[in-house]
């Protein structure tokens, strides 16, 4: 197949005001720019088919209607692939969450700079490219899986090998194994041996035996006095729905965020929203520390706060400030984590934590 992209490479932002685009839409009876894109992809497919080729496109080609013989590469989750399969088309599952090997595979500060994210070996191995809800007659339309390695941050072949191996071994086993027979502990033991074999052959795989793993507390809950307590958000402090981390209880569930803001464990505040939360301890409580972790990754515009204020109250109305921290945000290419906290002795029922965005 010949793959054609139709997202960043052919953005549609200018099409509504493009005279040529509008003229073509009118001539072909197309109601919107998505249908114009579909018209374009269909014409390309006809050309490719006439030359003995098949068209394979990223899941954006679903917008406006699929070309008759197209295969869909599902990268924004598996939903695009499922839509293709449901309409009788072939699909290749390649979701970013499991198949983008340009993400960090271990603690970012232990690895060469990467594009971001966190995709360890175990996460790759956990991928199921054929959802359980897929009917038996549709399974054959899932053509396979694909790993992707974009090389903006990969300057050498040796670096590329490190990003590929051993994660590609995990994806290969995902592709040929029924989920019922997969066993990560067994695979991990075999992967350790394969890494040594690859080294002996002159390759440069990731040093799996010295893997650090996820952030402490990201996989196993930690205990503290505020776990399970009610959290109230200020009127101008709503978190962004796309980064809810599980909702209003996320900041007191005992589970911290991992190495990536995309792991659904970090709450994000955008636009004019700021973090302003009050925790109700239910009764006057001795408090010795209050803190919250923040992440900064400048590329996708995830920044530290410029100021944090921690205060307490017994009535939920009048608060006494315990600590105010100013922070100079340094914009660089690193993935950094900082805990802004207070330690001391206080007694209160309500704890308020505020930040101001950089």
Q: Which ranges hold each PLM region?
A:
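Short, small-residue-biased leader/transition segments that mark boundaries at the very start
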Residues: 1-5, 356-358
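Active-site neighborhood of glycoside hydrolase catalytic domains
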Residues: 3-70, 75-83
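Extracytoplasmic/periplasmic, Sec-exported soluble proteins
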Residues: 32-36, 160, 302
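Hydrophobic, well-ordered secondary-structure elements that form the walls
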Residues: 48, 72, 168, 290, ...
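Flexible, acidic glycine-rich loops studded with aromatic residues
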Residues: 54-58, 65-70, 76-221
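Residues that line or immediately flank small-molecule/substrate-binding pockets and catalytic motifs
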Residues: 149, 235, 294, 355-357
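Disordered, acidic Ser/Thr/Pro-rich linker "stalks" and the adjacent N-terminal cap
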Residues: 215-287, 295-304, 324-334
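Trp- and acidic/polar-enriched beta-sheet ligand-binding modules for extracellular glycan
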Residues: 270-274, 297-357
């Amino acid at each position: 197949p010949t793959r054609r992209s139709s997202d960043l490479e052919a953005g549609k932002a200018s099409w509504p005001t493009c005279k040529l685009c509008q003229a073509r839409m009118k001539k072909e009876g197309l109601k919107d720019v998505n249908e114009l894109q579909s018209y374009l992809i269909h014409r390309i497919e006809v050309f490719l088919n006439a030359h003995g080729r098949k068209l394979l496109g990223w899941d954006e080609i679903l917008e406006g209607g699929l070309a008759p013989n197209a295969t869909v590469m599902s990268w924004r989750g598996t939903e695009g692939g499922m839509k293709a399969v449901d309409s009788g088309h072939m699909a290749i599952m390649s979701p970013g969450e499991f198949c983008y090997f340009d993400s960090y595979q271990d603690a970012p500060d232990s690895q060469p700079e990467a594009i971001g994210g966190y995709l360890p070996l175990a996460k790759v191995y956990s991928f199921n490219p054929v959802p359980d809800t897929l009917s038996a007659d549709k399974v054959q339309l899932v053509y396979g899986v694909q790993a992707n390695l974009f090389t903006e941050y990969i300057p050498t072949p040796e670096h590329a090998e490190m990003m590929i191996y051993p994660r590609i071994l995990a994806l290969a086993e995902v592709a040929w194994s029924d989920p019922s027979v997969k066993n990560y502990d067994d695979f991990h033991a075999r992967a350790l041996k394969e890494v040594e074999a690859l080294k002996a052959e002159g390759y440069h795989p990731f040093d799996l035996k010295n893997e650090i793993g996820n952030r402490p507390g990201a996989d196993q809950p930690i205990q503290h006095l505020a776990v399970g307590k009610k959290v109230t958000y200020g009127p101008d402090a709503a978190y962004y729905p796309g980064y809810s981390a599980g909702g209003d209880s996320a900041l007191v569930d005992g589970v911290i965020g991992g190495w990536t803001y995309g792991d659904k464990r970090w709450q994000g505040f955008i636009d004019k929203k700021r973090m302003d939360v009050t925790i109700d301890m239910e009764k006057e409580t001795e408090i010795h520390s209050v803190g919250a972790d923040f992440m900064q990754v400048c590329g996708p515009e995830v920044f530290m706060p410029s100021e944090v204020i921690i205060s307490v109250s017994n009535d939920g109305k009048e608060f006494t400030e315990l600590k105010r921290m100013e922070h100079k945000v340094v914009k660089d290419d690193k993935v950094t984590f900082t805990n802004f906290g207070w330690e001391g002795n206080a007694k209160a029922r309500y704890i308020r934590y505020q930040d101001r965005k950089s």
